[in-house]
Amino acid sequence: MKVLLIGGGAREHAIAMALKKNELVELYTLMKNKNPGIYSLSEEVSFNSETDVPAIKEFAEKIKPEIAVIGPESPLGVGAADLLEEMGIPTVGPKKLPAQIETSKEFMRNLFKKYEIDGSLKYAAFNNYGNDLETFIDEMTSLGKDVVVKPAGLTGGKGVKVVGEQLKDNEEAKIYAKEVFDKSIGGGNIIIEEKLVGVEFTLHGFVDGENITFMPAVQDHPHAYNNDEGPITGGMGSYSCPNHGLPFLSEEMLDRAEKIMEKTVNSINLEVGPYKGFLYGQFMLTADGPKIIEYNARFGDPEAMNLLPILKTDFLDVCFAIAEGKLDKMNIEFENKATVCKYVVPNGYPIDPVKNKELTVDKKAIENANAVLFYASINEENGKLYITGSRSAAVVGISEKIEEAEKIAQKAIKNFKGEVYYRSDIGTLDLIKKRIDRVKKLAK
């Protein structure tokens, strides 16, 4: 069974591992760097940019896969799924228009407005810097609300800036908004949104165009340093719980979040056609319930590393059900186990990361700790591993209890040597208690 995988990060390593649990799978991967984890699982690798559509076509024509799985968002934005579907290859990953739920923040917010989907917030879209933009920010200031400045297109998770985090106040938000237009960051258009106050969580679904099957809820940790301090990153780690909920999230709030995602899938279908793939909702649990911060048209990274290792159902079967619109015929199950994922990242990340430095990994010690190792932005050359400037590698602890899973991950994360750092507090009961206390304060 030939499977084409596009992408070379830790998320794709998790996808590759999950696919290879089925002994019939022969994996063929297109990626830009030599990720050693994916490379070792692949029959053949094409080293090309994941947005190089002619290279994707050439590789697909050569290997003739029976199904394709697209990992990152960038190939979705250039129509990789459209191409593969046109070639007659069942594909897991939305086509270019449905993928706008991630690639165009304006599309996403307008969809919520048009179809009256719950969980939206105050926002306005702008295609130039001027009085209208300044007036909108001034109105938010008069309401006592801070703002978030979001370039409308893809920025690799680096373009969004939040007042109180990267920006001092709403006046500085205006300065950054002008910079986005001047430098054409993320395509040059902008969404200005109210800043939400609450606790973040993520919810993933398998989507086949009509049906959505939910996965366990996960909490990501975007801040670089312990105690949720420092700059925002792509995610320093995450955890999930044995009951598939989260300690601060009631069943009612989880149900409301699921309904928001269900209505989103139906609305995308009505607006631009069926969405097939993985859908990842990033939510903020506020005093008014769950609000959507943004959607991603793929698995979250790090969340894929929490979710896929505890998937009991054959992942290849799930992928075919997504591509063929048959999720309603499947009973998808996850193990009732806790997971804790921790990333090692280059010193200086995410502002000014070191690059091309050697990373030594004691794989045996990680294995002895009963953790799972995932390689991320790593390049292997002549048998040595080099960090490339983004998140380097992750370990995942899996156990019956969150405390045990955290201990496994923490023991394993110490087995990397190089110019890297990590957060030691992810998955600890102290940090989880802070989340619970924060939600209690919101309720008051």
From Swiss-Prot:
State where ATP binds: 140-202
Q: Which pathway is recorded for this entry?
A: Purine metabolism; IMP biosynthesis via de novo pathway; N(1)-(5-phospho-D-ribosyl)glycinamide from 5-phospho-alpha-D-ribose 1-diphosphate: step 2/2
Per UniProt, Mn(2+) 2 binds at 294, 296
Q: Which SUPFAM superfamilies match?
A: Glutathione synthetase ATP-binding domain-like, PreATP-grasp domain, Rudiment single hybrid motif
Instruction: Tell me where in this chain the ATP-grasp domain is found.
Output: 109-324
Per UniProt, Mg(2+) 1 binds at: 282, 294
| PROSITE patterns assigned | ATP_GRASP (PS50975), GARS (PS00184)
Q: What positions does the entry give for Mn(2+) 1 binding?
A: 282, 294
Q: Which InterPro entries match?
A: ATP-grasp (IPR011761), ATP_grasp_subdomain_1 (IPR013815), PreATP-grasp_dom_sf (IPR016185), PRibGlycinamid_synth_ATP-grasp (IPR020561), PRibGlycinamide_synth (IPR000115), PRibGlycinamide_synth_C-dom (IPR020560), PRibGlycinamide_synth_C_sf (IPR037123), PRibGlycinamide_synth_CS (IPR020559)
Family the entry assigns: Belongs to the GARS family.
- Entry-linked HAMAP family: GARS (MF_00138)
Designated name of the protein: Phosphoribosylamine--glycine ligase
User: What is the scientific name of the source organism?
Assistant: Methanococcus maripaludis (strain C6 / ATCC BAA-1332)
What is this protein's gene name? purD
